[in-house]
């Protein structure tokens, strides 16, 4: 039996976390290692379903997504903050209180100031570093930003969803593409960290419109992106359209594929994608709130797995197509992504190329943008 090694190949991988492509991992000796810390903040989420929203967008039912169905009292908020702070680990250097689920700057000024004052109290004591919130692009104006300019808000996420006017109209968003462009530009001029939330599979959207939207967002250079698949929530206006047959949601495979293309586009522009897929919850997982659509509790993992499958196929086709068996080595942090959920990628590779076996092995000398394939042949010419 002959064994062959493919020449070293660098593949563009999901997260290089600041490493130079192709650079090997620099690992200290075991007795020199220090506890690893993460640049990502520890998020303390406070959900304010539909707070400040001028109307209901067709896809939205924040109460179902967040599991929060009543207005949050000051005591509720303080209790949640205290509960979450108990779970902070030494790996997270920074802590952020985050207000999600509504249109934060669309709330009355007194409510905005009250909530931010509560959160700022934790910053003042040193237990929390900063505050973030999500809001609509059309709420970004000088008057509203004056409300928060002396408070420790560092990050603002915009519910953009699409950069196509036809899609925005079909989903009844009520804001325009210029609203988003002006909002991002204004926030960046004021040195806020800016995030953009996008959705795949919205009514009126197409693959071409989706990619065009992503390109327009990329040109605005936000700091990070979240990507969510559109699902039909039982309490959303979209549910009626789905029942009448006016709206057909994407399949899971379609949603994963479209999200993959967005991820790779943003990755090529050095824009972080910090989340893909809805946050798993008991309400979503038990199926009582979702009528249809591409919900999966490990949606992001499915996207990463498809990216790794593409990488493996490309390398196999270049140097191991006629092998009987192969071994693929990857950075330890990427082994599960390479295997795919329930070893799905392994089975796909075996079927596609007729391999007797596909072994996956961790290799901490490989950078996060590398795979190495070794092939075995029974016979040699």
List each model region and its residues:
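Arg/Gly-rich low-complexity intrinsically disordered repeat tracts
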Residues: 3-38
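Conserved non-cysteine loop/helix-boundary elements of the Radical SAM core domain that shape
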Residues: 65-78, 87, 101-230, 234-254
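Auxiliary Fe-S-binding modules of radical SAM enzymes
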Residues: 2-5, 38-42, 237, 244-381
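Canonical Radical SAM [4Fe-4S] cluster-binding loop centered on the CxxxCxxC motif
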Residues: 39-76
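Short acidic/His/Gly/Ser-rich catalytic and metal-binding motifs that mark active-site loops
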Residues: 53-57, 233-239, 284-286
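Short helix-terminating capping/connector loops at secondary-structure junctions
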Residues: 89-94, 125-128, 320-323
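Short glycine-enriched loops at secondary-structure junctions
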Residues: 48-52, 228-233, 279
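Short acidic/polar active-site loop segments enriched in Thr and Asp
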Residues: 95, 129, 154, 223, ...
């Amino acid at each position: 039996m002959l064994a062959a090694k493919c020449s070293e190949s660098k593949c563009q991988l999901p997260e290089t976390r600041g490493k130079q492509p192709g650079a090997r991992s620099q690992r200290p000796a075991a007795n020199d290692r220090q506890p690893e810390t993460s640049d990502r903040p520890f998020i303390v989420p406070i959900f304010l379903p539909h707070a400040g929203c001028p109307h209901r967008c067709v896809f939205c039912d924040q109460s179902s997504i967040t599991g929060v169905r009543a207005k949050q009292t000051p005591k509720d908020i303080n209790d949640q903050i205290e509960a979450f702070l108990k779970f902070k680990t030494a790996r997270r250097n920074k802590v952020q209180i985050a207000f999600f689920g509504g249109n934060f700057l669309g709330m009355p000024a007194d409510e905005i100031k009250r909530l931010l004052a509560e959160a700022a109290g934790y910053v003042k004591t040193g237990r929390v570093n900063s505050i973030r919130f999500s809001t609509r692009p059309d709420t970004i104006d000088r008057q509203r930003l004056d409300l928060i300019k002396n408070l420790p808000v560092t990050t603002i996420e915009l519910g953009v969803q699409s950069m196509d006017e036809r899609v925005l109209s079909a989903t009844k968003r009520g804001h325009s593409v210029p609203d988003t462009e002006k909002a991002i530009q204004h926030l960046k001029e004021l040195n806020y960290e800016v995030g953009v939330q996008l959705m795949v599979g919205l009514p009126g959207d197409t693959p071409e419109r989706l990619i065009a939207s992503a390109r327009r967002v990329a040109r605005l250079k936000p700091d990070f992106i979240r990507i969510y698949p559109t699902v039909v929530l039982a309490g959303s206006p979209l549910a009626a359209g789905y029942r009448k047959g006016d709206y057909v949601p994407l399949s899971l495979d379609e949603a994963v594929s479209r999200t993959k293309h967005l991820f790779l586009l943003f990755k090529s522009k050095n824009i972080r994608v910090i989340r893909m897929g809805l946050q798993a919850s008991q309400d979503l997982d038990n199926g009582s709130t979702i009528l249809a659509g591409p919900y999966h509790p490990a949606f992001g993992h499915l996207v990463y797995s498809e990216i790794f499958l593409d990488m493996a196929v490309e390398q196999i086709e270049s140097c191991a197509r006629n092998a009987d068996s192969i071994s693929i080595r990857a950075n330890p942090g990427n082994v599960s992504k390479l295997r795919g959920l329930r070893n799905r990628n392994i089975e796909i590779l075996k079927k596609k190329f007729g391999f007797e076996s596909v072994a996956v092995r961790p290799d901490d000398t490989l950078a996060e943008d590398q795979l190495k394939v070794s092939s075995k042949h029974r016979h040699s010419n």
